[in-house]
């Protein structure tokens, strides 16, 4: 734990070691010490300010409007113990615990701290602090992406949803400034887009400029085969599976030509012949010349025998 080593020169922000992430920020928090170290005036009274939770520690920054000798107070998870959350009826919820002094931290011994959340959020802060401490102990610290960096290498973290801050346009409230190189994997400021990834290059061959009213050709449709001209208006690209007509549906085979002579239009009163009776079956072909004469003599004899006989009066 260190005293007066974690605040900016203007006392409007917190100094966070490089590589750590700010997980939560709470304003209007009161800090007091129920048990103070011996011979240290820095721990007297109640301090008002902003509380920050990072991947490895808790940092309290006293408000720049308050005249107090303790400007900042930093507590690493490894030096905190006996932390509890209290919910009094007529007072804000608070977190209480014991903190040990760190070598070179500006004080010696131990103290019992009390963090009161006047605007609420004590339970959420305590729960996240327990998760962060457990993750840090396993060597897998919690991370956050709520930071920004500019060309100077200065990191400025703001409340989620706030405007982006920079060295030219500082935040009006409590930015958190992080000194050091950018974390691994962050080399370009968000909002700048470089070369598109592989696979998003030029349009493949075979696709020219689409005609008016036609969008980009869908994937899987190449150049149409020969014999297919420009599609008529209102018709797009034919769906898949409709290629050339299958074999067998071309010119009709021999034997189905024009009907034989003598079969012209039917007499009046007869409609069109039913479907399937267009061609004569093999047994109903035209008779030969000899059969025609014999048939004519037979018909004449039948007519003569069937005529009635005339009787004399």
Curated annotation (Swiss-Prot):
Residues 179-276 are annotated as: 12 X 7 AA tandem repeat of Y-G-X-P-P-X-G. Residues 265-276 have a biased composition (Low complexity). A motif (PPxY motif 2) lies at residues 281-284. Expressed in testis. The keyword Repeat applies. The keyword Transcription does not apply. A motif (PPxY motif 1) lies at residues 183-186. GO terms for molecular function: chromatin DNA binding; transcription coactivator activity; WW domain binding. Residues 254-264 have a biased composition (Gly residues). Residues 254-313 are annotated as: Disordered. Pfam families: GRAM (PF02893). Sequence repeats lie at residues 179-185, 193-199, 207-213, 214-220, 221-227, 228-234, 235-241, 242-248, 249-255, 256-262, 263-269, 270-276. Residues 289-313 have a biased composition (Polar residues). GO terms for cellular component: nucleus; perinuclear theca; sperm flagellum; sperm head. Residues 8-87 form the GRAM domain. It comes from the Eukaryota. Keywords: Repeat. One of its GO terms (biological process) is female pronucleus assembly. May play a role in meiotic resumption and pronuclear formation, mediated by a WW domain-signaling pathway during fertilization. This is Postacrosomal sheath WW domain-binding protein.
């Amino acid at each position: 734990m260190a005293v007066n080593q974690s605040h900016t020169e203007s006392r409007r922000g917190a100094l966070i070691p490089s590589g750590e992430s700010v997980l939560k920020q709470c304003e209007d928090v009161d800090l007091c010490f129920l048990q103070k170290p011996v011979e240290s005036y820095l721990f007297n009274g109640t301090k008002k300010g902003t509380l920050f939770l990072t991947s490895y520690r808790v940092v309290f920054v006293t408000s720049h409007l308050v005249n107090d000798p303790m400007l900042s107070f930093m507590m690493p998870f490894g030096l905190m113990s006996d932390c509890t959350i209290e919910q009094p009826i007529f007072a804000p919820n608070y977190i209480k615990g014991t903190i040990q002094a760190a070598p070179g931290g500006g004080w010696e011994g131990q103290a019992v701290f009390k963090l009161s959340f006047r605007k609420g959020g004590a339970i959420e802060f305590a729960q996240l602090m327990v998760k962060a401490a457990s993750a840090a102990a396993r060597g897998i610290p919690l991370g956050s992406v709520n930071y920004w960096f500019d060309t100077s290498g200065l990191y400025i973290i703001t409340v989620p949803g706030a405007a982006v801050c920079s060295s030219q346009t500082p935040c009006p409230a409590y930015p958190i400034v992080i000194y050091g190189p950018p974390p691994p994997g962050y080399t370009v400021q968000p909002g700048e887009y470089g070369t598109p990834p592989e696979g998003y290059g030029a349009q493949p061959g075979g696709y020219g400029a689409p005609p008016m009213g036609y969008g980009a050709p869908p994937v899987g449709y190449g150049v149409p085969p020969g014999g297919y001209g420009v599609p008529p208006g209102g018709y797009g690209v034919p769906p898949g599976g409709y290629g050339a007509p299958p074999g067998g549906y071309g010119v009709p085979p021999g034997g189905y030509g024009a009907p034989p002579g003598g079969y012209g239009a039917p007499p009046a009163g007869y409609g069109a012949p039913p479907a399937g009776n267009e061609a004569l079956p093999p047994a109903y072909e035209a008779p030969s010349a000899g059969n025609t004469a014999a048939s004519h003599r037979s018909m004449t004899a039948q007519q003569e025998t069937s005529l009635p006989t005339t009787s004399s009066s």
